[in-house]
A protein has these predicted regions:
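Conserved beta-strand segments of the P-loop GTPase G domain that flank and frequently precede/overlap
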Residues: 5-6, 136, 160
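Active-site-proximal loop->helix
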Residues: 124-128, 148-150
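A short, charged helix-loop
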Residues: 135-148
Length: 165
């Protein structure tokens, strides 16, 4: 089973206890590079606090920034029955890596643990309901649809971006 765990803006510090238990038990841990940077120091701190046994090695760490490069390692872990965790931002099934995983792996091999997404948190900060907002994702996508979305003059338009946009 691949446990796909959403994180909020707090990263590892924002995970709930059941998700932390899955991370501690993982033999393969896949995450964006920004979260991977936190993992080794976090692992050592968990060992120092006695939440992970002192002799327990840090799991295999793999960056998910280019998802096509993780599939082989995930397939091997699943075939061998090794505990595997993939950390993602927010809700992995909302404009996230979850769609790609479902295209590649049977749903029975995936379990999703969503966290609030960035736009959900933004609307909460604004004190605005978000069910009537229009959404567009430019994350790794062509920005051309943004112009068409803006021409429709929605009352609220939320735009997901990535570091290059």
């Amino acid at each position: 089973m691949l446990e796909v765990i959403g994180t909020d803006a707090g990263g590892l510090a924002g995970l709930v206890p059941p998700s932390l238990a899955l991370v501690r038990a993982a033999e393969l841990l896949v995450a964006p590079a920004r979260l991977l940077a936190e993992l080794e120091p976090w692992w050592r701190a968990e060992q120092a606090a006695g939440r992970i046994s002192a002799g327990s090695p840090c799991p295999q760490l793999l960056a998910s920034d280019r998802p096509e490069l993780i599939f082989g390692a995930v397939e091997q872990a699943l075939a061998a029955g090794r505990p595997a965790v993939l950390l993602a931002s927010g809700d992995p099934l909302w404009f996230g890596i979850g769609r790609l995983l479902l295209q590649r792996f049977p749903a029975a091999q995936l379990r999703f643990h969503p966290a609030p997404c960035s736009l959900q948190l933004a609307f909460a900060r604004l004190g605005r309901p978000w069910q009537d907002a229009s959404w567009i994702s430019l994350h790794g996508r062509d920005p051309e649809p943004l112009a068409a979305a803006l021409q429709k003059r929605p009352s609220a338009l939320a735009v997901l971006t990535d570091p290059s946009r």
